[in-house]
Amino acid sequence: MSRATKIALLDYGMGNLHSASKALSAVGAEVSITNDPKVVAAADKIFFPGVGAMRDCIAGMHEAGIDDVIRQAIFNKPVMAICVGMQALFEQSAENGGTPCLSILDGTVPAFNPEWKDEKGVQIKVPHMGWNTISGMNFEHPLWNGIEDKAHFYFVHSYYCEPADSSQVAAICDYGQPFCASILQDNLFATQFHPEKSHTAGLQLLKNFVDWDI
């Protein structure tokens, strides 16, 4: 019997750690909630959560030393980031008039424009909160195994990622205009939506990450 995949769930004072830990455990992972670089180094994979204000997230990461941990881990093991964790990978967020991020990926994080309109001509509400569909996935990639086109996932965000390299976009969502719902670059995978809150499809995606063999 093969051993469970060890996942370091990064704890820097932000993120719904309990929900993420419970969901990852439910799909067979051995989860350690940690900010200890030694525990992270010993893990098979890294899970990078995030909710709340970007400025607070970046400050929390720096104080806990998680920013350096992420930069080191990104080169040698699979990493999955969600929501603000995904946004933090880029260079700068528009939040608070401009907040520097980790600059692991080139690109920015602009705000949704409340003047945008949906397909019915109704102005969108900000934040984008609730269920929405994603599309444009490469279904030959194992991370999307068992996920259908137009699958529903749960979103809560006022900002969205604009990667400088469009080849990193792994899925799109539409909210007033199409935006990047997921990125994939080598061993780095990230989603704007919350898989741990997305029921069957979310658990399938987390299982795919746990099983992902690069």
From Swiss-Prot:
Catalytic residues of the enzyme: 83 (nucleophile), 194, 196
Substrates-to-products reaction catalysed: 5-[(5-phospho-1-deoxy-D-ribulos-1-ylimino)methylamino]-1-(5-phospho-beta-D-ribosyl)imidazole-4-carboxamide + L-glutamine = D-erythro-1-(imidazol-4-yl)glycerol 3-phosphate + 5-amino-1-(5-phospho-beta-D-ribosyl)imidazole-4-carboxamide + L-glutamate + H(+); L-glutamine + H2O = L-glutamate + NH4(+)
EC nos: 4.3.2.10, 3.5.1.2
Chief location category: cytoplasm
Keyword set, alphabetical order: Amino-acid biosynthesis, Cytoplasm, Glutamine amidotransferase, Histidine biosynthesis, Hydrolase, Lyase
Biological process terms in GO annotation: L-histidine biosynthetic process
Ranges of residues in domain Glutamine amidotransferase type-1: 6-214
Gene3D superfamilies, sorted: 3.40.50.880
Pathway in which the depicted protein is active: Amino-acid biosynthesis; L-histidine biosynthesis; L-histidine from 5-phospho-alpha-D-ribose 1-diphosphate: step 5/9
Subunit structure: Heterodimer of HisH and HisF.
Protein name per Swiss-Prot or TrEMBL: Imidazole glycerol phosphate synthase subunit HisH
Species for this entry: Psychrobacter arcticus (strain DSM 17307 / VKM B-2377 / 273-4)
Gene it is expressed from: hisH
